[in-house]
Design a protein with these regions (language model features):
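Short, low-complexity disordered leader/linker segments with a strong preference
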Residues: 1-32
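Flexible loop/hinge segments at secondary-structure junctions
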Residues: 22, 27-340
Protein backbone atom coordinates (compact mmCIF):
# COMPACT_ATOMS: atom_id res chain seq x y z
CA UNK A 1 0.00 0.00 0.00
CA UNK A 2 2.79 2.41 0.94
CA UNK A 3 4.71 1.60 -2.23
CA UNK A 4 1.62 2.19 -4.38
CA UNK A 5 1.09 5.57 -2.74
CA UNK A 6 4.73 6.46 -3.29
CA UNK A 7 4.56 5.46 -6.93
CA UNK A 8 1.55 7.71 -7.40
CA UNK A 9 3.46 10.56 -5.79
CA UNK A 10 6.49 9.99 -8.00
CA UNK A 11 4.34 10.00 -11.12
CA UNK A 12 2.92 13.32 -9.99
CA UNK A 13 6.27 14.90 -9.22
CA UNK A 14 7.65 13.91 -12.59
CA UNK A 15 6.05 17.19 -13.60
CA UNK A 16 4.13 19.10 -10.96
CA UNK A 17 2.58 18.97 -7.52
CA UNK A 18 -0.71 20.62 -6.70
CA UNK A 19 -1.69 21.17 -10.34
CA UNK A 20 0.90 23.86 -10.95
CA UNK A 21 1.38 25.53 -14.31
CA UNK A 22 4.78 25.91 -15.98
CA UNK A 23 7.64 27.57 -14.12
CA UNK A 24 7.17 30.71 -16.18
CA UNK A 25 3.84 31.40 -14.43
CA UNK A 26 3.85 34.79 -12.71
CA UNK A 27 4.45 34.86 -8.98
CA UNK A 28 1.48 33.80 -6.87
CA UNK A 29 -1.33 36.21 -6.20
CA UNK A 30 -3.12 36.38 -2.90
CA UNK A 31 -4.66 33.05 -3.89
CA UNK A 32 -1.56 31.14 -2.84
CA UNK A 33 2.10 30.31 -3.45
CA UNK A 34 4.16 28.84 -6.29
CA UNK A 35 7.50 27.09 -6.06
CA UNK A 36 9.92 25.14 -8.24
CA UNK A 37 13.09 23.10 -7.98
CA UNK A 38 14.37 19.96 -6.30
CA UNK A 39 12.97 16.58 -7.31
CA UNK A 40 14.49 15.07 -4.16
CA UNK A 41 12.12 17.03 -1.91
CA UNK A 42 9.12 16.63 -4.24
CA UNK A 43 7.56 13.51 -2.61
CA UNK A 44 7.69 15.24 0.78
CA UNK A 45 6.43 18.46 -0.80
CA UNK A 46 3.26 16.65 -1.88
CA UNK A 47 2.45 15.91 1.76
CA UNK A 48 3.44 19.39 2.92
CA UNK A 49 1.14 20.98 0.37
CA UNK A 50 -1.80 18.74 1.23
CA UNK A 51 -1.35 19.22 4.97
CA UNK A 52 -0.81 22.97 4.71
CA UNK A 53 -3.85 23.50 2.50
CA UNK A 54 -6.02 21.57 4.97
CA UNK A 55 -4.62 23.48 7.96
CA UNK A 56 -4.43 27.00 6.52
CA UNK A 57 -6.60 26.92 3.41
CA UNK A 58 -3.75 28.39 1.35
CA UNK A 59 -3.01 26.62 -1.97
CA UNK A 60 0.59 25.89 -2.96
CA UNK A 61 1.72 24.75 -6.41
CA UNK A 62 5.14 23.21 -7.03
CA UNK A 63 7.07 22.27 -10.19
CA UNK A 64 9.65 19.50 -9.69
CA UNK A 65 12.12 20.68 -12.33
CA UNK A 66 15.45 20.11 -10.57
CA UNK A 67 17.49 22.26 -8.21
CA UNK A 68 19.24 24.23 -10.94
CA UNK A 69 15.99 25.27 -12.62
CA UNK A 70 14.47 26.10 -9.25
CA UNK A 71 17.27 28.54 -8.50
CA UNK A 72 16.81 30.12 -11.93
CA UNK A 73 13.08 30.48 -11.34
CA UNK A 74 13.39 32.21 -7.97
CA UNK A 75 16.18 34.43 -9.35
CA UNK A 76 13.84 35.59 -12.14
CA UNK A 77 10.98 36.11 -9.70
CA UNK A 78 8.65 33.73 -11.53
CA UNK A 79 7.91 31.73 -8.36
CA UNK A 80 7.60 32.55 -4.67
CA UNK A 81 10.20 30.02 -3.54
CA UNK A 82 12.86 27.83 -5.03
CA UNK A 83 14.01 24.46 -3.70
CA UNK A 84 17.55 23.16 -4.00
CA UNK A 85 19.61 20.35 -2.50
CA UNK A 86 22.77 22.33 -3.21
CA UNK A 87 23.94 25.69 -1.88
CA UNK A 88 23.89 28.52 -4.39
CA UNK A 89 27.14 29.28 -6.18
CA UNK A 90 28.54 32.84 -5.99
CA UNK A 91 27.15 33.44 -9.49
CA UNK A 92 23.71 32.22 -8.45
CA UNK A 93 23.81 34.35 -5.31
CA UNK A 94 24.56 37.40 -7.45
CA UNK A 95 21.62 36.59 -9.74
CA UNK A 96 19.34 36.00 -6.75
CA UNK A 97 20.39 39.12 -4.87
CA UNK A 98 19.07 39.20 -1.32
CA UNK A 99 17.78 35.64 -1.41
CA UNK A 100 17.79 33.67 1.84
CA UNK A 101 18.60 29.95 2.06
CA UNK A 102 16.60 27.96 4.61
CA UNK A 103 17.22 24.27 5.45
CA UNK A 104 13.90 22.44 5.53
CA UNK A 105 14.46 18.73 4.93
CA UNK A 106 17.05 16.00 5.46
CA UNK A 107 17.47 12.92 3.28
CA UNK A 108 20.07 11.12 1.18
CA UNK A 109 21.17 10.20 -2.30
CA UNK A 110 21.25 6.44 -2.65
CA UNK A 111 22.67 4.11 -5.28
CA UNK A 112 20.20 1.84 -7.02
CA UNK A 113 21.32 -0.92 -9.38
CA UNK A 114 19.87 -3.55 -11.70
CA UNK A 115 21.72 -6.84 -11.46
CA UNK A 116 19.54 -9.97 -11.74
CA UNK A 117 19.57 -12.00 -8.53
CA UNK A 118 21.33 -9.30 -6.51
CA UNK A 119 19.48 -6.97 -4.13
CA UNK A 120 22.26 -5.69 -1.88
CA UNK A 121 25.90 -4.88 -2.48
CA UNK A 122 28.74 -3.13 -0.66
CA UNK A 123 30.47 -0.28 -2.48
CA UNK A 124 33.29 2.00 -1.38
CA UNK A 125 33.90 5.56 -2.50
CA UNK A 126 36.92 4.65 -4.65
CA UNK A 127 34.94 1.87 -6.37
CA UNK A 128 31.99 4.20 -7.07
CA UNK A 129 34.41 6.78 -8.48
CA UNK A 130 35.99 4.05 -10.61
CA UNK A 131 32.59 3.12 -12.03
CA UNK A 132 31.75 6.71 -12.93
CA UNK A 133 35.24 7.27 -14.33
CA UNK A 134 34.59 4.32 -16.65
CA UNK A 135 37.52 2.37 -15.17
CA UNK A 136 35.47 -0.31 -13.40
CA UNK A 137 33.25 -1.69 -16.15
CA UNK A 138 32.01 -5.12 -15.04
CA UNK A 139 30.11 -6.30 -11.97
CA UNK A 140 32.60 -9.13 -11.43
CA UNK A 141 35.52 -6.70 -11.20
CA UNK A 142 37.99 -7.82 -8.48
CA UNK A 143 37.60 -4.52 -6.63
CA UNK A 144 33.84 -5.08 -6.27
CA UNK A 145 34.36 -8.78 -5.46
CA UNK A 146 36.76 -7.91 -2.64
CA UNK A 147 34.02 -5.86 -0.93
CA UNK A 148 31.43 -8.63 -1.45
CA UNK A 149 33.15 -11.98 -0.80
CA UNK A 150 29.86 -13.90 -0.41
CA UNK A 151 28.05 -12.39 -3.39
CA UNK A 152 27.68 -14.15 -6.74
CA UNK A 153 28.73 -11.36 -9.08
CA UNK A 154 27.85 -11.92 -12.74
CA UNK A 155 29.91 -11.23 -15.83
CA UNK A 156 27.76 -8.22 -16.69
CA UNK A 157 28.77 -4.82 -18.04
CA UNK A 158 28.14 -1.84 -15.76
CA UNK A 159 26.21 1.11 -17.20
CA UNK A 160 26.46 4.15 -14.91
CA UNK A 161 23.46 6.49 -15.10
CA UNK A 162 23.71 10.16 -14.13
CA UNK A 163 21.42 13.17 -14.04
CA UNK A 164 21.33 15.15 -17.29
CA UNK A 165 19.63 18.13 -15.63
CA UNK A 166 20.95 20.50 -12.96
CA UNK A 167 20.50 18.41 -9.83
CA UNK A 168 21.06 18.62 -6.10
CA UNK A 169 21.51 14.85 -6.10
CA UNK A 170 24.40 15.33 -8.52
CA UNK A 171 25.82 17.92 -6.14
CA UNK A 172 25.62 15.60 -3.11
CA UNK A 173 26.96 12.61 -5.06
CA UNK A 174 29.90 14.45 -6.61
CA UNK A 175 30.61 16.32 -3.36
CA UNK A 176 30.99 12.94 -1.67
CA UNK A 177 33.23 11.59 -4.43
CA UNK A 178 35.37 14.74 -4.31
CA UNK A 179 36.02 14.10 -0.61
CA UNK A 180 36.88 10.45 -1.25
CA UNK A 181 38.88 10.67 -4.49
CA UNK A 182 41.55 13.33 -5.19
CA UNK A 183 41.37 12.38 -8.87
CA UNK A 184 37.62 13.00 -8.92
CA UNK A 185 38.05 16.35 -7.19
CA UNK A 186 40.65 17.54 -9.69
CA UNK A 187 39.21 16.05 -12.90
CA UNK A 188 35.44 16.30 -12.34
CA UNK A 189 34.74 18.24 -9.16
CA UNK A 190 31.32 18.81 -7.66
CA UNK A 191 28.34 20.89 -8.75
CA UNK A 192 24.72 20.46 -9.77
CA UNK A 193 26.01 19.69 -13.28
CA UNK A 194 29.41 18.12 -14.00
CA UNK A 195 31.15 16.50 -16.95
CA UNK A 196 30.84 12.80 -16.20
CA UNK A 197 33.51 10.61 -17.78
CA UNK A 198 31.24 7.63 -18.47
CA UNK A 199 27.62 6.62 -18.55
CA UNK A 200 24.22 7.71 -19.79
CA UNK A 201 22.26 10.80 -18.74
CA UNK A 202 18.61 10.81 -17.66
CA UNK A 203 16.38 13.66 -16.54
CA UNK A 204 15.17 13.88 -12.97
CA UNK A 205 15.04 11.24 -10.28
CA UNK A 206 12.16 9.58 -12.10
CA UNK A 207 14.23 9.41 -15.28
CA UNK A 208 17.27 7.88 -13.58
CA UNK A 209 15.10 5.39 -11.70
CA UNK A 210 13.31 4.34 -14.90
CA UNK A 211 16.54 4.04 -16.89
CA UNK A 212 18.21 1.88 -14.24
CA UNK A 213 15.10 -0.31 -13.96
CA UNK A 214 15.03 -1.09 -17.68
CA UNK A 215 18.81 -1.50 -18.17
CA UNK A 216 20.46 -4.69 -16.92
CA UNK A 217 23.80 -3.87 -15.34
CA UNK A 218 22.90 -0.24 -14.70
CA UNK A 219 23.62 1.75 -11.56
CA UNK A 220 22.43 5.25 -10.76
CA UNK A 221 22.39 7.76 -7.91
CA UNK A 222 18.80 8.34 -6.84
CA UNK A 223 17.06 10.16 -4.00
CA UNK A 224 16.29 7.77 -1.16
CA UNK A 225 12.52 8.25 -1.40
CA UNK A 226 12.56 7.14 -5.05
CA UNK A 227 14.51 4.03 -4.10
CA UNK A 228 11.74 3.12 -1.65
CA UNK A 229 9.18 3.36 -4.44
CA UNK A 230 11.33 1.49 -6.97
CA UNK A 231 11.17 -1.78 -5.08
CA UNK A 232 12.62 -3.78 -7.96
CA UNK A 233 16.06 -2.13 -7.74
CA UNK A 234 18.95 -3.32 -5.64
CA UNK A 235 20.37 -0.82 -3.15
CA UNK A 236 24.05 -0.31 -2.33
CA UNK A 237 25.47 -0.02 1.16
CA UNK A 238 28.17 2.66 0.94
CA UNK A 239 31.33 2.63 3.06
CA UNK A 240 31.58 5.51 5.52
CA UNK A 241 34.62 7.07 7.16
CA UNK A 242 34.46 4.56 10.02
CA UNK A 243 34.81 1.74 7.50
CA UNK A 244 31.22 0.53 7.87
CA UNK A 245 28.90 -0.15 4.94
CA UNK A 246 25.57 1.60 5.50
CA UNK A 247 22.26 1.92 3.66
CA UNK A 248 20.37 5.21 3.14
CA UNK A 249 17.79 4.65 5.87
CA UNK A 250 16.38 7.03 8.48
CA UNK A 251 18.68 6.00 11.32
CA UNK A 252 21.83 6.32 9.22
CA UNK A 253 20.78 9.63 7.65
CA UNK A 254 19.99 11.04 11.09
CA UNK A 255 23.38 9.93 12.39
CA UNK A 256 25.14 11.73 9.53
CA UNK A 257 23.36 14.95 10.51
CA UNK A 258 24.10 14.48 14.22
CA UNK A 259 27.60 15.82 13.63
CA UNK A 260 26.19 19.30 12.86
CA UNK A 261 26.54 21.49 15.95
CA UNK A 262 25.93 24.88 14.34
CA UNK A 263 25.23 26.48 10.98
CA UNK A 264 27.20 29.26 9.27
CA UNK A 265 25.56 32.50 8.18
CA UNK A 266 24.71 30.89 4.82
CA UNK A 267 22.57 28.26 6.63
CA UNK A 268 24.14 25.58 4.41
CA UNK A 269 26.30 22.69 5.55
CA UNK A 270 27.67 19.57 3.87
CA UNK A 271 27.21 16.26 5.70
CA UNK A 272 28.64 13.97 3.04
CA UNK A 273 31.41 11.68 4.33
CA UNK A 274 30.88 12.79 7.96
CA UNK A 275 33.49 12.29 10.71
CA UNK A 276 34.57 8.82 11.79
CA UNK A 277 32.76 9.14 15.13
CA UNK A 278 29.44 8.87 13.24
CA UNK A 279 29.98 5.12 12.93
CA UNK A 280 26.57 4.32 11.46
CA UNK A 281 26.23 7.34 9.19
CA UNK A 282 25.20 6.98 5.57
CA UNK A 283 27.90 9.02 3.79
CA UNK A 284 25.82 10.59 0.99
CA UNK A 285 23.26 12.25 3.24
CA UNK A 286 22.19 15.81 2.48
CA UNK A 287 20.11 18.72 3.63
CA UNK A 288 17.77 20.31 1.13
CA UNK A 289 16.84 23.99 1.15
CA UNK A 290 14.17 26.53 0.39
CA UNK A 291 15.47 29.64 -1.36
CA UNK A 292 13.35 32.74 -0.92
CA UNK A 293 13.72 36.48 -1.56
CA UNK A 294 14.48 38.56 1.52
CA UNK A 295 11.61 40.89 0.66
CA UNK A 296 9.04 38.31 -0.38
CA UNK A 297 5.89 39.59 -2.06
CA UNK A 298 3.92 36.85 -0.33
CA UNK A 299 5.78 37.24 2.97
CA UNK A 300 2.95 36.22 5.31
CA UNK A 301 1.88 33.11 3.38
CA UNK A 302 5.49 32.14 2.73
CA UNK A 303 6.48 32.38 6.39
CA UNK A 304 3.47 30.25 7.33
CA UNK A 305 4.35 27.58 4.78
CA UNK A 306 8.05 27.50 5.67
CA UNK A 307 7.34 27.27 9.40
CA UNK A 308 4.87 24.47 8.74
CA UNK A 309 7.45 22.56 6.68
CA UNK A 310 10.17 22.66 9.36
CA UNK A 311 7.85 21.80 12.27
CA UNK A 312 4.55 19.96 11.78
CA UNK A 313 5.44 19.00 8.22
CA UNK A 314 8.40 16.90 9.41
CA UNK A 315 6.03 14.12 10.52
CA UNK A 316 5.47 13.15 6.88
CA UNK A 317 9.14 12.40 6.32
CA UNK A 318 9.65 8.95 7.82
CA UNK A 319 7.61 7.04 5.22
CA UNK A 320 9.63 8.75 2.48
CA UNK A 321 13.12 8.31 3.99
CA UNK A 322 13.38 11.91 5.21
CA UNK A 323 14.89 12.12 8.70
CA UNK A 324 13.76 14.81 11.16
CA UNK A 325 15.77 18.02 11.16
CA UNK A 326 18.21 18.38 14.10
CA UNK A 327 17.11 20.96 16.68
CA UNK A 328 20.04 23.25 15.86
CA UNK A 329 18.96 23.31 12.21
CA UNK A 330 15.31 24.00 13.07
CA UNK A 331 16.44 26.91 15.24
CA UNK A 332 18.55 28.40 12.44
CA UNK A 333 15.70 27.92 9.95
CA UNK A 334 13.20 29.68 12.23
CA UNK A 335 15.54 32.66 12.58
CA UNK A 336 15.97 32.87 8.81
CA UNK A 337 12.20 32.71 8.25
CA UNK A 338 11.61 35.45 10.81
CA UNK A 339 14.14 37.66 8.98
CA UNK A 340 12.08 37.78 5.78
Amino acid sequence: MIRNRLLAILIAVGGTVGGTAAVSTASASAAGLTGAGSTLVAPLMTNWINGFEIKEGIPVKYSAVGSGEGIKAISKGTVDFGASDAPMTPEQEAACSGCVTIPWALSATGLGFNVPGLKKINLSGPVIAGIYFGKITNWNDPKIAKLNPKAKLPNLAITPIYRSDGSGDTYAFTNYLSKISPAWKSEVGYATTVGFKAGVGAKGNAGVTSTVAKTQGAIGYISASYLIAAGSLGVAAVENKAGNFEFPNLKNIEEAASTVKSLPASNTVSITNPPKKATGAYPISTFTYAIVPHTAAQKGFLQQFLNYAITKGQVYGAALDFAPLPKVVVSAAKSAIASL
